[in-house]
A protein has these predicted regions:
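N-terminal Sec/SRP start-transfer signal
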Residues: 1-40, 51, 56, 320
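Hydrophobic, regular-secondary-structure patches
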Residues: 34, 38-118, 138-144, 235-239, ...
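Peri-transmembrane interface segments
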Residues: 54, 236-285, 293-298, 304-305, ...
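Transmembrane alpha-helical interface segments in multi-pass membrane proteins
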Residues: 292, 300-346, 350, 361-362
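Alpha-helical transmembrane segments of integral membrane proteins
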Residues: 29-39, 269-289, 323-330, 334, ...
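Basic-flanked hydrophobic alpha-helices used for secretion and membrane insertion
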Residues: 130-133, 150-249
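Residue-level signature of transmembrane alpha-helical entry/exit and packing/kink sites
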Residues: 25, 355, 359-363
Length: 365
């Protein structure tokens, strides 16, 4: 290692020699930096899972613009929207078609009497073009009463439960004291607000949510004509719809706003962000403590170098050399351990906790 550093630096690797002079102290310093790296990796991993699960449901929607209640921050919260807003929107130039979107939470009761929560989406069967190709291909079958498409990756549910369903056989289960029959599947998995996802027709949705009305969906989905800018149409809609009761966004804008709300305003996102900050501070404190102690221990040697005519940048180079060595040697075990913890956490929680391509660079630099 000394020879390699000597070639890279073009001089004797004084910083490396000083750090490794006491192997016990060096190992403790590396362990501290590795822990700080691990802490940041884990917080970023969980934040990444939150971002992924927040945006994933939007992949099942195929729309350009969404009209929501003024107080809605996510797909699942906020007041309902009067269906009349859909009819108003259809009169605006550039709007080609529209559909209501109903959203709710149902509890899936398993044979062992445990429950899993299902984030439930619904629209009219005739409006399946507003859904992704995967869902739309199966959605026409939901004209049958009390039928659904169920998430086979629902958290807390053994995959064997859906074995018959994957073979083309219907799967009946209990929801809110009623029987619902799954006749198709989708794959998403659990998130922070629900254990899985369910798609039903609007009529089935209204049967299971007795207090909901067909005249008050959660959102209104719109498609614009070919060659027309969704942003331009959204501005036209904002000019005629009451801002006090509804908000109009392109689907991309609403996704970005939803993610920002989850990350910056909800307690979960704030806690994870604070954890990243703490990890960075811990790393800075550990490295500073190691470097300051090492400098203090070698003041006599530095004084000798100074008397020999070495400039200030020489000493700065030694300190930066030590900082770089600690960063590299602490990063490697932190990265390896975090990969193992990611896999374990993902297996236990069914959250999409994984290492993306940019995260190692974010943490290291």
């Amino acid at each position: 290692m000394s020879k390699l550093l000597e070639r890279l630096l073009g001089r004797l690797p004084v910083g490396w020699l000083q750090l490794t002079h006491s192997r016990t102290r060096f190992a403790a310093a590396v362990a501290g930096v590795a822990f700080a790296n691990l802490l940041v990796f884990m917080q970023l991993g969980i934040m990444g899972a939150m971002s992924t699960t927040t945006l994933a449901p939007y992949n099942f929607l195929d729309a350009d613009i969404m009209i929501s209640a003024e107080d809605a921050n996510t797909l699942t919260d906020g007041s309902n929207v009067a269906r009349a807003r859909l009819f108003q929107a259809m009169t605006v130039a550039g709007v080609e078609s529209g559909a209501p979107l109903f959203v709710g939470i149902l509890e899936f009761k398993l044979p062992d009497w445990t429950n899993s929560t299902l984030q439930t989406f619904a629209t009219e069967v005739a409006d399946r073009d507003f859904l992704s190709a995967e869902i739309a291909a199966q959605f026409s079958r939901l004209t049958q009463e009390n039928t659904a498409l169920i998430d086979t990756k629902t958290r807390g549910v053994d995959a064997s439960v859906f074995a018959d369903l994957k073979d083309g056989k219907p799967f009946a289960f209990e929801v809110n004291g009623q029987t619902l029959t799954a006749i198709g599947t989708l794959e998403l998995g659990g998130g922070f607000s629900a254990d899985g996802t369910l798609f039903v027709s609007d009529q089935t949705f209204l049967r299971f949510f007795g207090k909901r009305s067909s005249g008050a969906p959660n959102h209104v989905l719109l498609k614009v004509a070919d060659g027309v800018s969704p942003q331009v149409v959204a501005e036209r809609l904002r000019s005629i719809l009451p801002a006090a009761s509804v908000q109009v966004n392109t689907l991309a804008e609403y996704k970005a706003a939803d993610l920002a709300y989850q990350s910056l305003e909800r307690p979960t996102g704030i806690i994870f962000g604070f954890g990243v900050l703490i990890g960075i501070i811990v790393g800075i404190v550990i490295v500073y403590q190691v470097l300051s102690t090492d400098v203090a221990d070698h003041l006599k040697e530095y004084a000798t170098f100074k008397a020999m005519g070495y400039e200030h940048r020489f000493f700065l180079g030694i300190v930066l050399e030590e900082a770089g060595i600690l960063a590299v040697f602490g990063f490697i075990p932190g990265f390896i351990v975090s990969m193992g913890l990611y896999a374990g956490l993902s297996a236990v929680t069914s959250l999409p906790v994984y290492m993306d391509g940019t995260r190692p660079f974010m943490v290291f630099f």
